């Protein structure tokens, strides 16, 4: 060994065997002794530990096993490890011949348990250099850490000053260490393998030869939990850059803590339907060792809660790829088992708010593997009613998983929270935390003792004089933050409101996350792929022509939307895009991930999704492509307005598997994973859809802000053989996408808190309408806050009756004023909900008006939207898809920030009108491209000829549209096109030279003429 490398090894050893490090210097003599032969552990050290911690049990065991009890003990230990795994045996021990043996003791939560502390101190923790791990060769591992003679961690060290790095250490594990060695048995001996040099640390939990996958175990370029990228920062104490590894991870108490509370064995079962209809079950398993940021965030949370108790909010900004599910599971377990210095549990229950089923399963498995005394995780899903949530809280279940929407039903049925403390973990925290359901969660769980004292002081009354049972007072007391509730909010994309509710307030008035694992770091460390690295944008260049003689006045915004929708759903547009989609899949996607790459098409509406589905099907059939399977995902059912008497489309009605069987909506994800190639979606699977084989996304929908990040991130999951992603965007310019991602690329903060008094501006504006009075508010309040009315279940009926005169006054307003009033009513309700999450206003009159407006907002009907149809007034004259960008969208290495949200003022709803010519010109200016005659959609002359043709008219009368389009119309079109060609060869030559254009024009005319001539009398 090189002297420089040796000094690095010695430095680490010297720390570990110091008083701070907690380990004992040892050699591998005990592992190579005759007593330990073929055991791959130090049996003498292990049995000495057992004798010292269970002396009576060992004596009993020796009486039972008179012949070589040590060998018998080893066999029992090995059987337990083979059956349950080393992690389980370390935590829970094993039972043999009626005797319970523990092979390791962990530090108790409370210092009051003296026996447990004594046994913990008896653990024999050895640091061994140059460990001879095999009897087949003389190879050694640089360093091994053993607990009571059992190898648990092995480390290969390299030093850049000798010309080697962590890459050499990883290669050594991959190529020079036989994974079949018993000492490296998966979950039987060594549990974690590290490669470390002067600057970087990597880790794996299973050796697989050259296939061994190492994960970065670095802090991040700015330090753990800080805003930065991959790597490690310069050491603050002048020591080695990687000193955190041995000081905060390998240190004895730290590593034993990881063995007890973090490292986890996960077993997953996946069922796959084979072509013959049979089911194949695949079982996989892995040992999960926490990544450094996961270890750091959980420990920081534990330390803060242990020091400060309940009552604090924590915002954890962890990117996709951070392992958020495990972080939540570890946080939940630690908070459920956390005790104070008096050995009292800090929290009575941990309540996890989530919509993810996979998290339920993961929590159940994780918690049960750690501590059997906590009981099982109680999941209140859609199969259980809200009463089950009430009972779980009242029974003091330690960990409860539920949705936010169940709290409004049971909030007043939960037993008094006085003296109780709750940890609320919010999975994917977002703006729903500012709604009424979040307020009801607080109403259910808040201990309002402190708020009551605060209110009494403001009212200048003694606490006992305050009518604490008054419903109005109760609701105000439940607002704001409470000393008995801690919120732990996890999200990758924190909005401004999320930051103000859960973030850390700073001296300068800004709000920041408690802990950060940024998108930038996740990408640089390779835990997610950069979805902006291969980005192509197209612009739809088209020209709309007016198809009427006059120039009618039409509502501007409606006309613009309608014309754009006309273009978006125009058959020619869909035909062109369908061709690009299919050819992109066949040329790009299909060749990725070993031929398993998949594509998602994100559409703007359910109708667009259905039409895309049919257009892609047509393109596949016309080109005889039989190697592309498409599926669709949308909610509910719909009919195509162009065919109102036709098929009613549903997701399950359109999807079939390879055997021709209908695919249930609940099976879409699984079947797409096994069989599908292209998935067309409409407002579905844009969040929470975890398909690692998804490589390409086609975007035909406007995306902004968080929605853009969440949608495009569907393709960022890593998978063996998946090296890149591809986005093809028909709608969004790169500047919009860059702006959306930049906000969440690194740390996201809020510049300053909201001005709470802005709600009084909204209140004043509302009163200016003269629609309701103080007397109206008092009448509604007297009903709402009357406990007898509530018991009789008469609240809704009485309030709706009281609001009838108010609704009548509202209906007397013109349409524009009605719209403005509705907006202001909803704004007051929304803003009061938000402010109530942050602070207690103790404004009785404002709270009454909030209740009044909450009911009024539900009773005021929106004005009916008048249907607006321009279909016969415009026509598509030019069309081209023009590629505008191809390459990477680069982001800057800087944090993002939000400005405080302001209440939106209600503008008028009345739409100004513009002449149709003006609107068409405006759209064409935006979308018109450089056109040649070859790009013109050749419709007009052919259309005029065919609409007069008797054969065309007769054909269009058929009720079977497919027969018309595929059998009758092509011959009529061909005859008409040839006649036009003979009349003007130059104008129509391109039509016959370009087969794709010929088909596109034919399909467009078939569609148009069928709609016009089918019902023409």
Question: Residue spans of the language-model regions?
Answer:
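Conserved RecA-like ASCE ATPase "motif II neighborhood" in helicase/translocase motors
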Residues: 390, 396-428, 432-444, 450, ...
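Interdomain helical connector at the RecA1-RecA2 junction of SF1/SF2 helicase-like NTPases
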Residues: 497-596, 613
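Post-DEXD/H (motif II) to motif III coupling segment of the RecA-like Helicase ATP-binding lobe
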Residues: 434-531, 541
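Catalytic cores and motor modules of nucleic-acid processing enzymes
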Residues: 14, 18-25, 41-72, 276-280, ...
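Conserved segment of the helicase C-terminal RecA-like domain
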Residues: 714-743
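ATP-dependent helicase/translocase motor core
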Residues: 2-349, 358, 362-373, 421, ...
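Conserved C-terminal RecA-like helicase domain
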Residues: 564-679
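A short beta-strand element within the Helicase C-terminal
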Residues: 680-681, 686-710, 725-729
